[in-house]
Design a protein with these regions (language model features):
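Alpha-helical transmembrane cores and adjacent cytosolic helix/loop segments
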Residues: 1-209
Length: 209
């Protein structure tokens, strides 16, 4: 019994380290993306940056959840609240991106080229799958729906990186102004789905474990 408790504490500590890294990485990623996106007028890049800031919120709530892992009642209560906070944040972001991307499409407003955005998307494609896999292992070992949801969130960030990179490259290479708002619009249902599942408190990461 004591050995199992100590092992669980060790796993929870590993989860905390992953969330500290998530907060640090996504703060940097979000700042670079939002600043570069604002300078280039890229809604997909700004949306990607805001998604990174939501991951910061998610990381902070997961740290909060991990801090009471030994207390079953508080753990379950924090677990549900963590999922809802992340879910609401996702829905708000989906609404914002949908509005801005449709506005840009109707106004035929394309962004300027963003080398910083392209580099950021490539780096994110390397970092996020590794982070998602590590979180998924911790979530599986702890039986934590909130950690599993956060792992899935990191995995979806990889998908968003692919969409972002595609839009930026198409615009840079072919001059397709509509590629950026279209990329942002494609992100919207993915983000909204994650938000709805978070609010419902669903464990979204069985495949990540």
């Amino acid at each position: 019994m004591l050995e199992a408790t100590l092992d669980r504490r060790s796993i929870a500590q590993r989860g905390k380290r992953l969330e500290y890294f998530t907060i640090a990485w996504n703060t940097l990623e979000g700042l670079v993306a939002v600043i570069a996106g604002a300078m280039a007028g890229s809604i997909s890049l700004v949306g990607f940056g805001l998604d990174s800031f939501i991951e910061v919120i998610s990381g902070a709530t997961l740290l909060w959840r991990m801090s009471v892992d030994a207390d079953l009642s508080r753990r379950e209560r924090n677990e549900k609240l963590s999922l809802r906070i992340v879910g609401i944040s996702f829905l708000a972001l989906a609404a914002y991106i949908a509005f801005e991307s449709i506005t840009d499409m109707l106004g035929k407003k394309g962004p300027e080229h963003s080398v910083a955005g392209i580099i950021l998307a490539i780096v994110s494609l390397i970092v996020m799958p590794l982070l998602s896999k590590a979180k998924g292992r911790v979530g599986h070992e702890l039986g934590s729906a909130a950690m599993n949801a956060d792992a899935k969130q990191s995995q979806f960030c990889s998908y968003l990186s692919v969409i972002l990179l595609s839009g930026l490259l198409l615009h840079a290479a072919l001059g397709w102004w509509w590629a950026d708002p279209l990329a942002a619009l494609i992100m919207t249902p993915i983000i909204a789905r994650e938000g709805l599942q978070g609010i419902r408190g669903e464990d979204r990461c069985h495949e990540c474990c």
